[in-house]
Structures are given as structure tokens and as C-alpha cells.
């Protein structure tokens, strides 16, 4: 497995390095994307594909009286996320679990918001995963997707050649999948190659 395969599912020592790098490298696009999330101070938020936990930490700051849960299918990512958010976990404001977005262990209609930063590229069955997100969201809840790539450049295509199982979706494709899953009020925000999409249940 190449080092860059760790972007999909971090494993071993290389995976530990990768999640640390992603916490730093994805910071600018994540901060930009979070501007489009309107969440109450006491919101319940789920971060799918939580990686190294940096966005969980940002969400906890955005919702200081809320609860933030994270899910990732990489044990390395879960371990890192727990370390980064250890204080909030002890306080009962944060939970990080290992699992698949395609079959989540959460109750129906539980979250006020669900986020997915730099992760939908790797979801194996996007329609099914979007239906799962729809299931766990409350009516009126928001699903936010934030990506550094919108499939508009040759560089995007090169990444899909380097990293197995990676698909870079255009904003129009994501919008169509979201609407098929039942979402409405789909809004698309762009900044150069960056993409942020919000959708309502």
C-alpha cells in the first residue's frame, strides 16, 4: 500500500503520520466550510469520516453546550480523534466510534447537523451513505459536505489515479445524489477549487 492510500483508510505508522498531516493540511478548507453551518450552541452534531479529530474540536467550539459525535472506519483515526478531544470526551460532550457511514449505529432523527470534511471521495456507495445521513438527521437538520476538490482540474484526476477507491465528485453530481436521498434546499458554495454543499432534511 502506498503512503497516500492512508488518506482513504489510515493504518499503521504511516496512517498515524497521515492523520496528523490531514489535521493541519485540511484546516483552511474546514474553517472556510464551517462558516456555512448554522448550528445552535446546544446542537447535536455528527462528523462522518472524522479522521484526526480536528473538525470535531472545531464543532465542539462552535456548539459549546452541544454534543459532537464522530465516526470513522479507521482505528488509527478513531484513536487520534479521541486523543485530540480527550477533555470533551471526559466531560461527556464527545463520543468517537469506529464504524461505517453506510450502516451507522445512531438512532433515527437524532442529530441537528451532520458534517463530512474531505471524506465523501471514499464512501463506497454514496446513495446508500446519503440515505443513512438523512435517516439520522432531525427534520430540518443540515448536512454539510466540504471538499478541497470539485473534479474541475487535471490535478484532481491524478489524485484518483494515485489513491485507490477515490472518486472526486462534481458539485452537480453531489446535488443530484443528495436530492435522490430526500434532501432539499441544496446550496453550493465555491472558492477556487474548494467546494462546500449544505442540504436540509
What do these predicted ranges mean?
Residues 113-125:
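A short SAM/SAH-binding and catalytic strip from SAM-dependent methyltransferases
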Residues 44-103:
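Class I SAM-dependent methyltransferase SAM/SAH-binding core
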Residues 127-139:
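A short glycine-rich, Lys/Arg-flanked "PGG" loop and its adjoining helix->strand segment in the class I
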Residues 42, 137-142:
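Short glycine-dipeptide loop
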Residues 102-113:
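A short acidic, Gly/Pro-enriched loop at the edge of an enzyme's catalytic core
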Residues 24-43, 58:
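Conserved alpha-helix/loop element of class I SAM-dependent methyltransferases that forms part
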Residues 13-23, 142-198:
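C-terminal alpha-helical "lid/dimerization" subdomain adjacent to the S-adenosyl-L-methionine
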Residues 1-14:
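N-terminal, positively charged/glycine-rich alpha-helical extensions of SAM-dependent methyltransferases
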Amino acid at each position: 500500500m502506498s503512503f497516500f492510500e492512508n488518506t482513504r483508510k489510515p493504518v499503521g505508522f504511516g496512517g498515524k503520520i497521515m492523520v496528523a498531516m490531514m489535521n493541519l493540511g485540511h484546516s483552511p478548507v474546514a474553517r472556510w466550510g464551517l462558516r456555512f453551518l448554522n448550528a445552535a450552541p446546544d446542537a447535536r452534531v455528527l462528523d462522518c469520516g472524522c479522521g484526526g479529530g480536528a473538525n470535531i474540536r472545531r464543532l465542539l467550539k462552535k456548539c459549546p453546550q452541544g454534543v459532537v459525535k464522530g465516526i470513522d472506519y479507521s482505528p488509527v483515526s478513531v484513536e487520534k480523534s479521541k486523543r485530540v478531544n480527550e477533555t470533551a470526551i471526559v466531560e461527556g460532550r464527545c463520543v468517537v466510534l469506529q464504524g461505517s457511514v453506510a450502516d451507522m449505529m445512531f438512532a433515527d432523527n437524532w442529530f441537528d447537523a451532520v458534517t463530512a470534511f474531505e471524506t465523501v471521495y471514499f464512501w463506497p456507495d454514496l446513495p446508500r451513505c446519503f440515505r443513512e445521513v438523512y435517516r439520522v438527521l432531525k427534520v430540518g437538520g443540515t448536512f454539510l459536505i466540504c471538499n478541497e476538490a470539485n473534479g474541475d482540474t487535471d490535478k484532481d484526476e491524478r489524485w484518483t489515479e494515485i489513491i485507490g477507491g477515490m472518486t472526486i465528485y462534481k458539485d452537480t453530481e453531489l446535488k443530484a445524489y443528495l436530492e435522490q436521498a430526500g434532501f432539499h434546499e441544496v446550496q453550493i458554495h465555491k472558492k477556487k477549487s474548494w467546494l462546500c454543499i449544505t442540504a436540509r432534511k
